[in-house]
Amino acid sequence: MQHNVLILDFGSQYTQLIARRVRELNIFCEIFPFDKIPTDLSIYKAVILGGSPFSVRSEDALHPDLSEIRGKLPLLAVCYGAQYLAHFSGGEVAASNTREYGRANLTYIKENETFFENVNLNSQVWMSHSDSIKKLPTNGIKLASTQDVENAAYKIEGETTYAIQYHPEVFHSTDGKQMLENFLVKIAQVPQNFTPNAFVSDMVAELKEKLQDDKVVLGLSGGVDSTVAAVLLHQAIGKNLYCIFVNNGLLRKNEFQSVLDQYKGMGLNVKGVDAGDRFLSELAGISDPETKRKTIGRVFIEVFDDESKIIENVKWLAQGTIYPDVIESVSVKGPSATIKSHHNVGGLPDYMKLQIVEPLRMLFKDEVRRVGATLGIDAELLGRHPFPGPGLSIRILGDITPEKVQILQDVDAVFINGLKEHGLYDKVWQAGAILLPVNSVGVMGDERTYEKVVALRAVESTDGMTADWVHLPYEFLMKISNDIINKVKGVNRVVYDISSKPPATIEWE
């Protein structure tokens, strides 16, 4: 695959959004840590430097080696990147009189600049910095200003180097995508050839070449990612793909058999393994979220390994890993830190001695769905909401018991079926219920009750990197609340989670 654009990560919360905006232009891009620049740059057509929570003026400033990039490849420096180029190339960066966060407008744009084609004066941009460029670097030419930031954008004469102090990737920068397109397509002349059809064609060919006649084993989860990965691999190697669908006892109500039947109907070579009792036994008494995740991961590997050994001469383990999994799980030296262990990355024990193949690891969730549609996968299956690998275990706060799982499965079924019946399911990116570790007082009939509280969660998102809570109709929430309390024994109170990501995560654990 042609890696057309290289994005260097300095720890900004917005780095992944840069990648999303670039992908929306049908341009492939990849994120690398600032201190792990690929040695072979011949496959890249342009480079983007991201933002950072660090200051270029501090002792712990992050220093990329741009010796093979600067002046040799088209370069766009965003925020910290723009300040870095200025500070270490003859310019001056100083602390701003006031910290500049939020909306601003371009009050000056240099005429006849390709970077600002189809961008009007007063275009809104998003600022997020506490330093400002007081003096441009050597050969710097000012391209744009805001009311408070004189050098909001500049270029370096004699180079294809551009720099901006705002964030074009953020939604609030109304012409940000246009600026990225101007830089990548018109200035850097990057081809716009990263499409679902092209990906399928390239990946199937790549898998055929890599796997040859080797046997591959894949753990199916019922979700979109592993399903699309399975169909891609099936197209490439056919009967040499062996799929295992493990029931960990923490799936949605009646999901194991219905999904297993779907897989068989798609022609996949799949075996269903019901290990629910084993998982629940191992989880008994565990309340800590990380311990839950790791226990589920360990038991899954044990079950999966037992089943894999039945298949002779397996050489590869396939996984449905996607790009946000990789981004959230990799700790980058300096700016980044792992928030929580991710259920789709890592955990493979050495004794399995299988090589890893991850056909989707460079795709965002919405791209996976488009690839699935290209592969002809049923729209209903592709439209399934994301569901965490640890299943309902991380939606049961506190310890896990079969009784709690049953309650949550019933609550979840009422909620999800209600969304479908009211035409709301496809308007929501992800939805589910959370069983809280508290009881509340209620009244049913003439009796006082002291029963469980559940929270409902519904979010809208593109790829799970950020998410907003969905404004479900009050009438719908009222009906679902009543249905849950009336139909699910042991629940007497329902609340609705209105937190966005960030600062909250989509899942509660």
Curated annotation (Swiss-Prot):
Q: EC no.?
A: 6.3.5.2
Keyword Signal on entry: no
Q: Where is the Glutamine amidotransferase type-1 domain?
A: 4-193
Which species expresses this protein natively? Flavobacterium psychrophilum (strain ATCC 49511 / DSM 21280 / CIP 103535 / JIP02/86)
Enumerate the InterPro entries for this protein. Class_I_gatase-like, GATASE, GMP_synth_C, GMP_synth_GATase, GMP_synthase, GMPS_ATP_PPase_dom, NAD/GMP_synthase, Rossmann-like_a/b/a_fold
Cross-referenced Gene3D superfamilies: 3.30.300.10, 3.40.50.880, HUPs
Q: What is this protein called?
A: GMP synthase [glutamine-hydrolyzing]
Report whether Signal shows up as a keyword of the record: no
Active site as annotated:
79, 167, 169
Pathway as given in its UniProt record = Purine metabolism; GMP biosynthesis; GMP from XMP (L-Gln route): step 1/1
Disulphide bonds in the chain: none
Where does it sit, as one GO cellular component term?
cytosol
Looking at the record's lineage, which domain of life comes first?
A: Bacteria
Q: Which PANTHER family match?
A: GMP SYNTHASE [GLUTAMINE-HYDROLYZING], GMP SYNTHASE-RELATED
Q: Which UniProt keywords apply?
A: ATP-binding, Glutamine amidotransferase, GMP biosynthesis, Ligase, Nucleotide-binding, Purine biosynthesis
Ranges of residues in domain GMPS ATP-PPase: 194-384
Q: Which residues bind ATP?
A: 221-227
Reaction(s) this enzyme catalyzes, per UniProt: XMP + L-glutamine + ATP + H2O = GMP + L-glutamate + AMP + diphosphate + 2 H(+)
Molecular function (GO) terms for this protein are: ATP binding; GMP synthase activity
Task: Write one Pfam family the protein is assigned to.
Answer: GMP_synt_C
Q: Could you tell me what this protein does?
A: Catalyzes the synthesis of GMP from XMP.
Self-association or partners: how does it assemble?
A: Homodimer.
